[in-house]
Structures are given as structure tokens and as C-alpha cells.
């Protein structure tokens, strides 16, 4: 597939690369700044939180379907501790998943533990802490809004451009 040539210049989604690229890059910059401004943590710590969150979500979705509101209630009620028994998430596992040095990962997790955003238990490993919901819920709503806005801002040609990208063999 040639992303540079097309017979019909007016409807060529590949000609929309510049707009699709700009929209995507601005979304990423906005996301980075939102993490920094809203959560006041570094991006690696944010991604560590996402690993902990995804670990719980992965096992939770196997058991039940829950709404946005139910998710926060379950997190607030320490559901992760019950759900993740015998499915522990460790510092070593997070370090391996993110390809971060183990000591860096340990220090960042220690900081999140101190703020009670995360909690470490012998039965369930690293899970969401008592301050996780207050810390993360407002940001998550803004992020969901931002993702929705990003997706809806894409024109049909932008979407075609991304569809074409998926056809390229990497």
C-alpha cells in the first residue's frame, strides 16, 4: 500500500495525514499535561497506577460487567483485595511489564504507598489504596471526556487514514 499516491486527490485519506497527526500529537500533549497538572505526579508513576488498575480490571471483567459508578464504589470498598487474592501484583511484575528498573519502580510505588493511593497486602500484592478513588476519579472523568472529544473530532477522512495505517505490514 502506498500512502503517498492516489488517483483522487480530493478524497484521499492519506492527504489528511497532517491533520490526523496534529490532532493525535495534541491529544498526547494534553494528556501528559493533564496528568502533571491534575494528579501532580510524574508520568511513570501514572503509568504504574494504570498497571495496577488494569490488573484489577482484567480479573474483574472475567467475573462481572460493571458500570462507571459501580467501578468506583467497588474500588472504594477494597474489591481489588478480594478479587486479586492469589493473583498478586508485585513490584517485580510491574517493573517487568513497564521495562523500568526495579529500584525506580520500587521508589515510585513507595511514594504512592505513602500517599495511600496504593496499598500493599500479603494476600493480594499491590492494589488500590484508600485514597485512590479521591485521587483518580476526577482525572479519569476528564480523561474519558478528552478521549471522547479526540475520537469525535476525527473527520471521516482522518478515520480512513488510520484505517489505512492498519493495513500497512510492520
Language-model features, listed with the residues they occupy:
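N-terminal leader segment of winged-helix/HTH proteins
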Residues: 1-50
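Intrinsically disordered, acidic Ser/Thr/Pro-rich low-complexity regulatory segments
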Residues: 36-38, 44-49, 62, 66-70, ...
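Amphipathic alpha-helical interface surfaces
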Residues: 44, 87-90, 105-108
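Short helix->loop/beta-hairpin flanking segments within DNA-binding domains
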Residues: 47-87
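A short alpha-helical element within helix-turn-helix/winged-helix DNA-binding domains
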Residues: 81, 86-96, 112
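Short amphipathic alpha-helical interaction segments
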Residues: 99-114
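Short, amphipathic alpha-helical interaction segments positioned at domain boundaries
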Residues: 134-167
